Amino acid sequence: MEKNTLIQILNNLIEKYKTLLKENGKVASGDLLNSIKGEVRVDNNLYTFVINLNDYWKYLENGVNGTAVDNGSTYSFKGKTVNTDAIEKWITVKGIVPHSINNKVPSTKQLAYVISRSIARNGIKGGHYLNNSLQSTNFINNIIEEFSKQVNIEINKITEVNI
């Protein structure tokens, strides 16, 4: 089996996934994108495709239910707010400037708190970016095709020897 071909199939999947995240505005700091690494492992003719990435990919993929809104996810927010530190970082990275309300400009911390309450209440809708990447790159079919080619090569070798 050509491991390089399998690596290329995996890399195509990863690039498509990164593209979908970018196209859908799911890149702020780039931490998730930079964490994505793929690997094909081979052990005694057992092929394993591994994608390592930050844990929060699953929330972008599957969404998170809010305390007031069910987004059909297996994950749910329990409290009234989510991690305000992460929201503050997101505000800073995105360059979001709070607008004046009643001649008072909220601090980044205050804005993060309001946003975190909204996220906890409404949840996060899943984007299914990895699943969509799997489908659009024909990942499974491409792997099956590569293994089929290898099986045909092996069958031809056997039949040539036995003829």
Predicted regions and their residues:
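Charge-rich, low-complexity N-terminal segments
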Residues: 1-46
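Charged, low-complexity interaction tracts
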Residues: 31, 35-163
